[in-house]
UniProtKB/Swiss-Prot annotation:
This is Phosphate import ATP-binding protein PstB. It is a peripheral membrane protein. It comes from Polaromonas sp. (strain JS666 / ATCC BAA-500). ATP binds at G49, P50, S51, G52, C53, G54, K55, S56. The gene is pstB. The complex is composed of two ATP-binding proteins (PstB), two transmembrane proteins (PstC and PstA) and a solute-binding protein (PstS).
Amino acid sequence: MDTLTASREKLAEKSKISVKNLDFFYGKFHALKSINLEIPEKKVTAFIGPSGCGKSTLLRIFNRMYELYPEQRAEGDVTFDGENLLTSKKDVALIRSKVGMVFQKPTPFPMSIYDNIAFGVKLFESLNASDMDERVEWALRKAALWGEVKDKLNQSGSSLSGGQQQRLCIARGIAIKPEVLLLDEPCSALDPISTAKVEELIAELKNDYTVVIVTHNMQQAARCSDYTAYMYLGDLVEFGATEDLFFKPKRKETEDYITGRFG
């Protein structure tokens, strides 16, 4: 499929992550095919498309999560702050401190709410007790959770509701002060009220972070994102401003997917 239309979409904003000629393989399976994409800084970019199209695969390349699994490899350029992440000699943990990730299912650590936030910070910074207290409160406030948990910080993170757990995971992700936050279907396991709270939070987070979200929910992409990429069978079909892609798509494949004639 020709992806030149998608890859040449011009952005007015500064690019935070630049993807050029990216291919990805699960063993011999060619999962992503010559992806070209610019992720704008301090905006929300959504990846949409049917199951198996490569959305989550692309997301996990941005912090080299794929390296945790055998026989997976990426080829091409994924430039972040002027450096190709795929060939960087930096400690992967250092890369992930700059590119945080929140998964589909809430994954609080088996420890207190406080320690869930402090755990990652301790890996990269040596803060005294007072400064750590301030960082924990700051992260929980950023995740719109402080008011709900400030009196029970010593309770287990798993004691929270599903929506609260997901916001705890977001707080944990931003506590180390990354530059990019990756969200892999963060609302798929949540009820509508919790989903609304997370969507409000996403709108707030883009003031400080570059946010990339994978979602099966096209309405969510339309509500939350500034830019949207439509993917199909490992190809980037179309990329552009969310309003344009949803209301004036350039590709028939995109229009068919959005209007429900496909997928």
